[in-house]
């Protein structure tokens, strides 16, 4: 992999990008309402360039997700989908679905516990993005707010900023150069590393998104509750995980095979 250098990018603010933002939901009603209120309140000129897709990963919430999305459907460009089978952790399958349904070249894939400001959206829509690049983002750690924020990445709490492992500003050709997220990991919290490794590094390079270098743009992880968010997820310690990892790596090393893998293993419907 090429070494990432951040100081040699000439950021151009002369282009306006249409961007689709996709989030997966699994019963986090408060966070869903937060995002709906946030996107409802952004300036109209920005709304014209932003589409938001919520994908309900079969959360058993008695229709609350659908009701909320329908209540907000006229306040911003909103599309919502519901997966019909609860197969456990399926964030990556939902992302495959979102990318298949997206109508824009540029897409921001985030988790529903990611909070951000309008300034960040303005920067993404007003910056000339390079088609041979995809972008990662700083994560703000607020240990007073939530001492358990991503403890596995910073057990000694030495870091102030790291790149989030699952937040991408990425164009469609770059995303599909991976063949999509690997559905072999459905039900397990695994697959971020394999997705990153499957990106065609001969064509695409990753950069930290930082138009002003010293700007305060960041994303904040709000109360992730990672261990209890799915009712029936399989843990990463199941015996066959390593077999899945080995199989996926071998397949993704084959450019032909990785583009023939299944993208969705569930029924779904569009709500809004």
Residue positions per predicted region:
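Glycine-rich, basic loop-to-helix element that forms the pyrophosphate-binding segment
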Residues: 85-101
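Cell-envelope/extracellular polymer assembly enzymes that use nucleotide-activated donors
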Residues: 17-22, 51, 194
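Conserved catalytic core of nucleotide-sugar-dependent glycosyltransferases
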Residues: 99, 117-184
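Short aromatic/hydrophobic "clamp" motif used to bind/position activated sugar donors
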Residues: 107
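C-terminal catalytic/acceptor-binding lobe
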Residues: 186-272
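Acidic donor-binding segment of Leloir-type glycosyltransferases
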Residues: 39-85
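Short, well-formed alpha-helical segments that are part of the catalytic scaffolds
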Residues: 28-43
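The conserved acidic donor/metal-binding loop of glycosyltransferases
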Residues: 111-115
């Amino acid at each position: 992999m090429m070494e990432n250098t951040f100081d040699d990018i000439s950021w151009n603010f002369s282009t306006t990008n249409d961007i689709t933002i996709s989030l997966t939901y699994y019963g986090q009603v408060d966070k869903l309402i937060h995002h709906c209120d946030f996107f409802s309140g952004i300036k109209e000129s920005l709304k014209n360039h932003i589409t938001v897709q919520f994908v309900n990963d079969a959360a058993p919430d008695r229709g609350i997700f659908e009701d909320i999305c329908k209540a907000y459907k006229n306040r911003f460009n909103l599309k919502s989908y519901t997966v019909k089978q609860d197969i456990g952790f399926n964030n990556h399958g939902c992302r495959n679905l979102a990318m298949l349904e997206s109508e824009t070249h540029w897409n921001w894939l985030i988790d529903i516990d990611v909070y951000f400001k309008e300034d960040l959206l303005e920067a993404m829509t007003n910056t000339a993005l390079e088609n041979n690049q995809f972008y990662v983002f700083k994560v703000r750690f607020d240990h007073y707010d939530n001492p358990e924020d991503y403890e596995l990445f910073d057990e000694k709490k030495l870091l102030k900023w790291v790149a989030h492992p699952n937040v991408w500003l990425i164009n469609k050709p770059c995303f599909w150069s991976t063949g999509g997220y690997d559905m072999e990991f459905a039900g397990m919290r695994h697959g971020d590393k394999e997705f990153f490794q499957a990106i065609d590094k001969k064509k695409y390079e990753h950069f930290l998104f930082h138009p002003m270098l010293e700007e305060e743009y960041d994303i904040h992880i709000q109360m992730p509750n990672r261990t209890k968010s799915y009712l029936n997820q399989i843990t990463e310690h199941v015996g066959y995980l390593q077999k899945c990892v080995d199989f996926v790596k071998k397949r993704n090393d084959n450019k032909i095979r990785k583009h023939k893998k299944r993208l969705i293993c569930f029924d779904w419907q569009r709500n809004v």
